[in-house]
Amino acid sequence: MNLLVFFCFFLLSCIVHLSRCSDNNSYSFEIVNRSTWLNIAERIFKGNAPFNFTIIPYNYVNNSTEENNNKDSVLLISKNLKNSSNPVDENNHIIDSTKKNTSNNNNNNSNIVGIYESQVHEEKIKEDNTRQDNINKKENEIINNNHQIPVSNIFSENIDNNKNYIESNYKSTYNNNPELIHSTDFIGSNNNHTFNFLSRYNNSVLNNMQGNTKVPGNVPELKARIFSEEENTEVESAENNHTNSLNPNESCDQIIKLGDIINSVNEKIISINSTVNNVLCINLDSVNGNGFVWTLLGVHKKKPLIDPSNFPTKRVTQSYVSPDISVTNPVPIPKNSNTNKDDSINNKQDGSQNNTTTNHFPKPREQLVGGSSMLISKIKPHKPGKYFIVYSYYRPFDPTRDTNTRIVELNVQ
């Protein structure tokens, strides 16, 4: 019985071996034992054609009752694969590398672009164009919408070297009107007396900055100024902004400590009354080493809509200066400073003498992460009115996780 099985197996192997000569996808079956494995391995490693191998214990194939004592033999099934080293033409056919190509001899610099590379390139352009159309559509909807807008990075770089304005970077989209570049981060309503952050460019600046963009319609990082609605004449207001800039060393007329840090996404509004040219110091608790930073996100005339997903993904370090109000970005309090007092409004209201916050979360003490520290931001209003100053304690690389937002509603008389 075993002899008959072996003969049938040998005959099948011969048939498969003969078909492999003409078929590039054929299989081969071989019995491998201690006396033959070295020769088979040598032939495999010396060969140039790629193979796919499967090994099955031969004693199980030969006799499932394991009556055969030869337990060291295995059945090796190999499959020839297509030679991927040969190039592929545009019709997805393999080009024989042995054929002579006279065109390559005439032009050594010519390269054959396969169908796969061209498809990927076309899909990349389509994807970029689709994303660009979605951005333009979203911006047009926001321009025509008078509802509240999400808070995001309101800072921008100065187009000239005038340091009277705040500087930063942001990505902007070039629309049909080359004299007006607007982004969802900078759009404000024209009817609700909010600050309007529209970046203005002339044709020459845009043409020079578009330069070497790879995908049509994309504009590199642009530099722009911040303008408020009241600044109809930006050139005239530049001198006023210089005089309105807040000195970081200016003494505090009033000291406020904002609410406690909570381990979840939350938002809190603190109402404060002040007077013109009165310096209000905001003390902010911070925990070192956890990636969270206190950031000044904006100044508004109406309460903005808070959306952490639109927060800047890069750390903002700029302060805010305008003819109406000046606000410094939070910075660490010097060790010898006397601004860390206990006469804070929130300290009295929230009971800061306890070791836990009103939400039963531990306060940032020395035993937490890398220790606690105190930051300070100074606010100086130059004109009466109501202002909403937005601070946020969040991770720039993960703005939607445990973001603490504090909005100072400042009523200036």
From Swiss-Prot:
Q: Which InterPro entries match?
A: Chagasin-like_sf (IPR036331), Prot_Inh_falstatin (IPR024321)
Q: Where is this motif: BC loop?
A: 284-294
Instruction: Write down what this protein is called.
Output: Falstatin
Q: Which Gene3D superfamilies match?
A: 2.60.40.2020
Spell out the Pfam families in the cross-references.
Answer: Inhibitor_I71
Query: Origin, by domain of life?
Result: Eukaryota
**The UniProt record lists the keyword Glycoprotein:** no
Residues making up the signal peptide according to the UniProt record: 1-21
Q: Partners and quaternary state?
A: Oligomer; probably composed of 10 monomers.
Regions of compositional bias (Polar residues) in chain numbering: 325-339, 346-360
Gene of this entry: ICP
